[in-house]
């Protein structure tokens, strides 16, 4: 606003000062009260801090612009590099500011030309790629390989990485000294910026230090160089195609081997196998793939959003329709409208006109998109997240956008690029599948921040229009008063649904999950939403620290199994019998069923021993020549030690006569994953010494058809040696009425 309103080399008038201040206040308040940023600001997540870094680097580049011709202006560039490095330890979203920052530099240093802009964009994208892949992952990747070489030569873990880091430090020190001595300003700036970027990036060292202390919560266990590399590459989240890839109906026609994976056991790196990369039928691959997931619920949603009927094969037109209808409209523009037009409610939706849409508060417009709004039940009319902004923030922002382009096209392009890179570019990069586990509006807060800059400039636009009809100072004051209505409306509408005081649902569920369990129990939970509240209440409030929470999503990883085999808080180690080498990553990740015509039920302990055997006779050979373990049967039996059951109070006294001699069950899947193997190992060898529970929210697929031996004791099913009678109402297992009453009424 200063660059537009103030006249160069003139003392600003009162009206101009008021306009500039009001623009800043209105824009800042509008962003403060946007739905997405406000929610991020009041939850314990990384996105508020990430947005802080986005804001401060944008502020810093404009501070540099003001003094760009001064001798020491380069200090601002170095500060930006340091802040970028620090932000990497928070979230990678901040890196998307780089192209916008590069444009500011170009417009300040060079006369405008389309070729110049194109070159600047190309250079900025190269810088972005270098930071993303060359520094964040590449620095550690090279260090890990050097550390491997040193370790194989007899040195301890991290020796090679430390040597490598010292070489980098020495090279940078000499380079900076040389550039200073030879007066090579550009080289000096590049090296200093790189050095400070690395300095900020070293904040990740605390992750390694923390992991080496083996705390109870230690995701990915990044205590060696290869584990840290996997942590940085977010390998647990898998890959998705971006530029070229398969449709969901593409068949796998082959596979290639990726880089070798390593893990550390007893201070030595050992190979765990190369990553297998599937190759898909080229006839069913496309550029810009959007519909790639083969999960059945995703496939049905792809068809729904792209207009595919029946068994029709997806075409590129369907691919684009899904991109625009779901990924762009539903997963970006809907969120944009939440923040600047209004929000229907806080119920997550998947296209239903009753859940999670945008509304304006203007009846005839809302009726066009969502049907008559006057016939809604009170529960929907009075939803606290039903926020109506009447298009006011959107209209003021559009006025500011037009005014910005009219008065200062170069800087308007900077803001537009920031909007695109932190909005639309993220949509393309994330390539989201349908049925996301939560609303993802927080990922686009940077784009909403950019639009709020235009909301602020809307004040200047209105003041500029009004001063043609009245004195300039009066116009500025009137524009300020009019535009303050916008953030006021946003604050008023959002106040009740963004106040998280007394919101204890997640905490209370966690409390009830844990208190459904007997002392020293093990409880299996489904994923992040089920597990994190339990971890919080144990770690922060100290509630039921004797219970071991096992996240089934993480149980497919070797590092997590290692952790739950250690004591944590008051909880004893989980008594798995498998050794690390038997479940190390790349080993028994997937165990298929091969029918060997085994009659009847097989002892589960024998099956575990067979599946974990390294004897070639216990394996089958794939077409590629690899040997792997398999399940010879899907019918299992566990012998029940009735004395141990009674001694450990596994069942209520009145139910001891119902204890069976054997637990017999048959899995329905044609394979088991590593997590299933660990569950089977635990129930086979636990011998009823440790209570075992499954949270009621765990999916049937993870129950392994054990439901007939489940006993409800609250918000968890206990695994017991009592076979429940079939219940026509669909009730899972039996109910321990006395225990359940005690848990509900007294805990």
Model-derived regions: residue spans:
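Short mixed-charge
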Residues: 3-23
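ER/secretory pathway lumenal C-terminal domains and tails of membrane proteins involved
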Residues: 7-10, 37, 42-51, 56-79, ...
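Short helix- or helix-capping micro-motifs
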Residues: 24-32, 84
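Phosphate- and divalent-cation-binding pockets in alpha/beta enzyme and binding domains
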Residues: 532-536
């Amino acid at each position: 606003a200063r660059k537009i309103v103030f006249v160069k080399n003139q003392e600003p008038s009162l009206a101009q000062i008021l306009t500039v201040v009001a623009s800043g206040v209105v824009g800042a308040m509008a962003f403060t009260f946007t739905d997405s940023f406000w929610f991020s600001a009041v939850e314990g997540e990384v996105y508020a801090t990430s947005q802080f870094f986005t804001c401060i680097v944008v502020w810093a580049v404009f501070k540099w612009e003001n003094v760009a011709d001064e001798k020491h202006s380069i200090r601002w560039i170095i500060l930006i590099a340091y802040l970028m490095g620090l932000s990497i330890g928070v979230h990678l979203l901040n890196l998307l500011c780089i192209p916008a920052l590069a444009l500011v530099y170009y417009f300040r240093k060079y006369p405008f030309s389309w070729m110049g802009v194109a070159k600047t964009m190309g250079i900025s994208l190269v810088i972005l790629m270098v930071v993303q892949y060359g520094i964040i992952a590449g620095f550690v990747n090279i260090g890990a390989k050097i550390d491997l070489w040193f370790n194989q030569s007899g040195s301890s873990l991290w020796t090679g990485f430390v040597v490598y880091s010292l070489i980098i430090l020495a090279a940078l020190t000499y380079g900076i000294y040389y550039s200073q001595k030879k007066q090579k300003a550009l080289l000096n700036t590049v090296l200093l910026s790189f050095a400070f970027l690395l300095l900020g990036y070293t904040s990740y060292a605390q992750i390694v230090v923390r992991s080496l202390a083996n705390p109870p919560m230690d995701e990915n266990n990044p205590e060696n160089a290869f584990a840290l590399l996997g942590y940085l590459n977010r390998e647990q989240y898998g890959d998705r195609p971006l530029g070229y890839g398969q449709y969901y109906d593409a068949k796998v026609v082959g596979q290639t081997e990726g880089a070798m994976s390593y893990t550390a056991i007893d201070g030595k790196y050992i190979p765990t196998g190369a990553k297998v990369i599937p190759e898909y039928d080229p006839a069913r691959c496309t550029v810009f793939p959007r519909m790639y997931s083969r999960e059945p619920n995703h496939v049905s949603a792809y068809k729904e959003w792209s207009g595919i009927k029946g068994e029709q094969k997806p075409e590129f037109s369907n691919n684009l329709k899904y991109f625009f209808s779901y990924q762009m409209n539903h997963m970006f523009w809907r969120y944009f409208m939440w923040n600047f037009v209004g929000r229907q409610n806080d119920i997550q939706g998947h296209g239903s006109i009753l859940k999670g849409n945008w509304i304006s508060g203007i009846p005839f417009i809302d009726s066009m998109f969502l049907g008559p709004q006057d016939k809604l039940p009170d529960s929907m009319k009075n939803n606290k997240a039903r926020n109506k902004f009447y298009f006011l923030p959107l209209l003021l922002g559009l006025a500011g956008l037009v005014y910005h382009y009219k008065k200062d096209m170069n800087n308007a392009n900077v803001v537009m690029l920031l909007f695109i890179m932190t909005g639309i570019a993220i949509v393309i990069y994330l390539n989201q599948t349908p049925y996301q586990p939560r609303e993802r509006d927080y990922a686009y807060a940077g784009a909403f921040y950019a639009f709020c800059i235009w909301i602020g400039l809307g004040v200047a636009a209105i003041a500029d229009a009004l001063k043609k009809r009245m004195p300039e100072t009066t116009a500025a004051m009137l524009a300020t008063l009019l535009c303050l209505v916008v953030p006021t409306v946003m604050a008023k509408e959002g106040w009740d649904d963004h106040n998280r005081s007394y919101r204890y649902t997640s905490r209370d569920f966690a409390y009830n999950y844990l208190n459904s369990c007997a002392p020293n129990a093990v409880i299996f939970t489904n994923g992040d939403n089920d597990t994190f509240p339990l971890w919080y209440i144990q770690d922060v409030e100290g509630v039921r620290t004797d219970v071991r929470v096992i996240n089934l999503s993480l149980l497919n990883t070797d590092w997590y199994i290692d952790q739950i085999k250690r004591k944590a808080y008051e909880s004893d180690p989980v008594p798995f019998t498998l050794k690390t080498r038997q479940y190390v990553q790349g080993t028994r990740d997937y165990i298929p069923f091969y029918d060997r015509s085994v009659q009847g039920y097989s002892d589960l302990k024998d099956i575990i021993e067979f599946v974990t055997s390294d004897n070639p006779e216990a394996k089958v050979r794939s077409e590629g020549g690899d040997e792997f373990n398999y399940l010879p049967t899907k019918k299992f039996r566990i012998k029940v030690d009735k004395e141990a059951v009674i001694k450990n109070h596994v069942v209520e006294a009145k139910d001891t006569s119902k204890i069976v001699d054997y637990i017999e069950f048959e899995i329905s899947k044609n394979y088991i994953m590593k997590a299933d193997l660990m569950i089977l190992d635990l129930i086979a060898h636990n011998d009823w010494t440790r209570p075992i529970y499954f949270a009621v929210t765990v999916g049937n697929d993870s129950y392994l058809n054990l439901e007939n031996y489940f006993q409800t004791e609250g918000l968890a099913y206990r695994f017991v040696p009592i076979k429940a009678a079939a219940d026509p109402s669909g009730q899972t297992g039996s109910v321990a009425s006395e225990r359940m009453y005690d848990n509900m009424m007294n805990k």
